[in-house]
Amino acid sequence: MNLNATLIGQLIAFALFTWFCVKFVWPPIIKAIEERQSSIANALASAEKAKQDQADSQAAVEQEILAAKEEAQKIIDLANKRRNDILEEVKTEAENLKATIIAQGHAEVEAERKRVQEELRVKVASLAIAGAEKIVGRTVDEAANNDIIDKLVAEL
């Protein structure tokens, strides 16, 4: 192999160029690459953290929705129970009122029956006395009439 000055010059130029690139060009390129790697890693970590935060938030929202549904169901159940209680109370009051009205009606009917019965006894007794007077043909005195009417009413 033949070494001449051109080859030595090229070797020196290549060595200087390599030293210059390693000393001045390579560090900024490496620094830019490392910054880019760091930026990408941070972005990926941030995205992963955001994804985890979103999943946590989604779980929290689902828990809140579930709790709200349970609370709404409790309110609905309470309202239904209250409605049933009110209906039962009204039904009981209506039954009591019905029983009271029926009892009152029976009492009124019974009182009216007794009054009519008593009135009828008095009329029957008066008619019996009148009939007896016509049959006998004479009038019994007033005191005797009242006595007879009272006895007849008591017997009827």
From Swiss-Prot:
CDD domains: ATP-synt_Fo_b (cd06503)
Topology term for the membrane: Single-pass membrane protein
GO cellular component, one term: proton-transporting ATP synthase complex
Pfam families, per database record: ATP-synt_B
Principal cellular location given in the protein's record: membrane
Keywords assigned by UniProt, alphabetized: ATP synthesis, Cell inner membrane, Cell membrane, CF(0), Hydrogen ion transport, Ion transport, Membrane, Transmembrane, Transmembrane helix, Transport
Intracellular or extracellular location(s): Cell inner membrane
TM annotation in the entry: 7-29
Keyword Chloroplast recorded: no
Coiled coil spans: none
Top-rank lineage group of the source organism: Bacteria
MF GO annotations: proton-transporting ATP synthase activity, rotational mechanism; proton-transporting ATPase activity, rotational mechanism
SUPFAM superfamilies linked: F1F0 ATP synthase subunit B, membrane domain (SSF81573)
Family: Belongs to the ATPase B chain family.
Subunit structure comment from the entry: F-type ATPases have 2 components, F(1) - the catalytic core - and F(0) - the membrane proton channel. F(1) has five subunits: alpha(3), beta(3), gamma(1), delta(1), epsilon(1). F(0) has three main subunits: a(1), b(2) and c(10-14). The alpha and beta chains form an alternating ring which encloses part of the gamma chain. F(1) is attached to F(0) by a central stalk formed by the gamma and epsilon chains, while a peripheral stalk is formed by the delta and b chains.
Protein name, as recorded: ATP synthase subunit b
Source organism of this protein record: Mannheimia succiniciproducens (strain KCTC 0769BP / MBEL55E)
Lineage of origin: Bacteria, Pseudomonadati, Pseudomonadota, Gammaproteobacteria, Pasteurellales
Gene name for this UniProt entry: atpF
